[in-house]
Amino acid sequence: MYAVVQVRGVVNTRRDIKETLKMLRLHHINHCVIVPETPEYLGMIRKAKDFVAFGEVDAATLATILTTRGRLTGNKPLTEEYVKSATSYGSIEEFASALVNGEVRMKDVPELKPVLRMHPPRKGYKTTKRTYTQGGALGYYGTEINDLLIKMR
């Protein structure tokens, strides 16, 4: 699973990139989505790579951000009790590990919003105009996206 976080805004941006971010459900800065590792999603992420940060998320980090930032319809927080009653998993950690392994999707939890509205990272982004390999905050992070997500929890 990939975690994709929008880092830059879309003012004065090409229409195809705006539409790609819209298809990824990224409408605002610091919003995060969890997408499967399919060629279709990877193509969309590569098209928007200059506006997003992305990488492979692990189960522990995903469980943390689902606990802190997961929301249900009506802006209610995602709780252990709701996951137990709505799915066959006993906790958010079990659901997160199944999600990372590809056994389940986000939409399998009814009323779970697909977008996680994250806090800006503590200590800030390095720079939003350079890629991660150049010392910035854009593009492919690999497994180090987990550090960014923990800073944004």
UniProtKB/Swiss-Prot annotation:
InterPro entries per UniProt: Ribo_uL30_ferredoxin-like_sf, Ribosomal_uL30, Ribosomal_uL30_arc, Ribosomal_uL30_CS, Ribosomal_uL30_euk_arc, Ribosomal_uL30_ferredoxin-like
Keywords linked to the UniProt accession: Ribonucleoprotein, Ribosomal protein
Record flagged with keyword Ribosomal protein: yes
Example GO molecular function: RNA binding
GO biological process terms held by the UniProt record: maturation of LSU-rRNA from tricistronic rRNA transcript (SSU-rRNA, 5.8S rRNA, LSU-rRNA); translation
The UniProt record lists the keyword Ribosomal protein: yes
Source organism superkingdom: Archaea
CC annotations in GO: cytosolic large ribosomal subunit
Coiled coil: none
PROSITE patterns: RIBOSOMAL_L30
NCBIfam families per the UniProt record, alphabetical: PRK06049.1 (NF004711), uL30_arch (TIGR01309)
Family statement drawn from the similarity comment of this UniProt entry: Belongs to the universal ribosomal protein uL30 family.
Entries under PANTHER family matching the protein: 60S RIBOSOMAL PROTEIN L7 (PTHR11524), LARGE RIBOSOMAL SUBUNIT PROTEIN UL30 (PTHR11524:SF16)
Subunit structure, interactors included: Part of the 50S ribosomal subunit.
Protein name: Large ribosomal subunit protein uL30
